[in-house]
Design a protein with these regions (language model features):
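Active-site gating loops and adjacent loop-to-helix segments of metal-dependent hydrolytic enzymes
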Residues: 39-72, 148-151, 197-215, 220, ...
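C-terminal cap of metal-dependent C-N hydrolases
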Residues: 303, 343-393
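Histidine/acidic residue-rich metal-binding segments in metalloenzymes
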Residues: 103-117, 134-243, 260-282
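His/Asp/Glu-enriched, well-ordered alpha-helical/loop segment
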Residues: 182, 203-214, 250-254, 264-352
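Alpha-helical scaffold segments that flank or form the walls of functional sites
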Residues: 24, 41-94, 103-114, 139-146
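Active-site mouth loops of central-metabolism enzymes
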Residues: 59-75, 124-136, 156-163
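Histidine-rich, glycine-flanked metal-binding segment
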Residues: 1-25
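Di-metal (Zn2+ and/or Mg2+/Mn2+) metal-binding site signature of metallo-dependent hydrolases
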Residues: 22-44, 190-191
Length: 393
């Protein structure tokens, strides 16, 4: 298989597909989603009236007990189909393991195997109700890793006390090193400027030499830190080489809920992280669950929202925007050695309905086709508009 100009003339007896000069990029990477939660927003008892993170966790805790493996898989399949048809071929999903039955984990592990030929999925052992605030949460995380989860998760800002939060961060590092796993922590997902677990996570990962294997998801509190502290923090973040994930639509929805006016946007310092050369990427996070009732798995929508909210409209930023849902996400998943369009790597790519990066962002274009290991996952026919009005043709 080959990509290049005039292949139909070079290989007259071989099927060729004319990309018509459209933009070829690596597949989208969604580095933060919760597949076990998708399409639960309208279930009885799941409605989040305050729109806060903490009510979302409460609603999930109260409704998750009756879920079955088959029901979770049925919902997650819908989300996976949407993400794949929007161009995603790599994904990292958190799965709630504060459930002694491991219902969600078993369901998503089965789906990971079922979909392995069309999308790569990393699974995070995520203690949604706390590693220590939920009795035996640390043991459940460890058991999930033994069962096959790929990544260690935590949620230190949700623990009952600061000390318990710090303990959970250190336990995450310990488990990752013990089982040779990656790390992805829900970190400082709050407007509280005193929530500073990202500092501890960066320090511990740096001192243990695993910064590049570590990710801080959300880090919303960084948007509320005073600049003197943030300036000091950035030195450590650069040293650690830790990754960051921002979820623009989710963060702007959940944060700022305790403000009157002015209201905070609730995102981490994406622009500043990017300008400092610290790896940062965007993600979907939720698809219609107790935290966020909308979402459809289209990362182009996430990118558009993120660039607006983060004041990243400089022309060069727009020209490089796709990095935030492609190469930066791949680095976060630590798959950069096999990801990308290069000789010797799998022929995985998507074709966007645009001629260049700027126009792709400008029009929020769709994906014309997706190719994986040299085979088409799908082709999309161009949009046809039927009109008799000359000015609209």
């Amino acid at each position: 298989k080959e990509i290049g100009p005039n292949l139909s003339e070079k290989y007259k007896d071989v099927e060729t597909y004319d990309l018509k000069g459209d933009l070829v990029v690596p597949p989208y990477v969604d580095p933060h989603i919760h597949l076990d939660y998708v399409y639960t927003a309208r279930m009885p008892g799941a409605n989040n009236g305050t729109g806060t993170l903490f009510e979302g966790i409460q609603r999930w805790s109260e409704t998750k007990g009756n879920m079955t493996i088959d029901e979770i898989k049925e919902r997650a399949r819908i989300a996976l189909k949407k993400e794949i048809l929007y161009g995603t071929q790599y994904m990292r999903t958190h799965v709630d393991v504060t459930d002694p039955k491991f219902t969600g984990l078993k369901a998503i592990m089965e789906l990971k195997e079922e979909y392995k030929d069309i999308i790569d999925i990393q699974i995070i052992a995520f203690p949604q109700e706390g590693m220590y605030s939920y009795k035996g949460g640390d043991e459940l995380v460890e058991e999930a890793l033994k069962m096959g989860a790929d990544v260690v998760g935590a949620i230190p800002h949700f623990e009952f006390t600061r000390e318990m939060g710090e303990k959970s961060v250190k336990k995450t590092i310990e488990l990752a090193m013990k089982y040779n796993k990656l790390i992805d922590v829900h970190c400082d997902e709050t407007d509280d400027d005193q929530s500073r677990f990202v500092e501890l996570l960066a320090a511990e990962s740096y001192l243990n030499g695993i910064g590049e294997l570590t990710t801080a998801s959300h880090a919303c509190a960084m948007g509320s830190y005073n600049n003197a502290y943030a300036f000091k923090l950035f030195k450590l973040l650069k040293l650690s080489k830790m990754n960051f994930i921002s979820c623009p639509t989710e963060n702007i929805h959940l944060q700022g809920r305790y403000d009157t006016y002015p209201k905070r946007r609730g995102l981490t310092r994406v622009k500043e992280l990017n300008d400092a050369g610290i790896n940062v990427c965007f993600a979907q996070d939720s698809i219609s669950d107790p935290w966020y009732p909308l979402g459809n798995g289209n990362l182009m929508n996430i990118l558009d929202a993120g660039f607006h909210v983060c004041h990243m409209m400089y022309v060069d930023e727009i020209n490089n925007a796709l990095d935030l849902i492609t190469t930066n996400g791949a680095k976060t998943l630590h798959i950069q050695d096999k990801y990308g369009i290069e000789v010797g790597k799998d022929a995985n790519f998507i074709v966007l309905n645009a001629k260049n990066e700027f126009d792709a962002i400008l029009e929020r274009v769709g994906v014309n086709c997706s190719v994986r290991r040299g085979e088409f996952l799908f082709k999309r026919e161009p949009e046809v508009i039927d009109t008799k009005i000359t000015l609209l043709k």
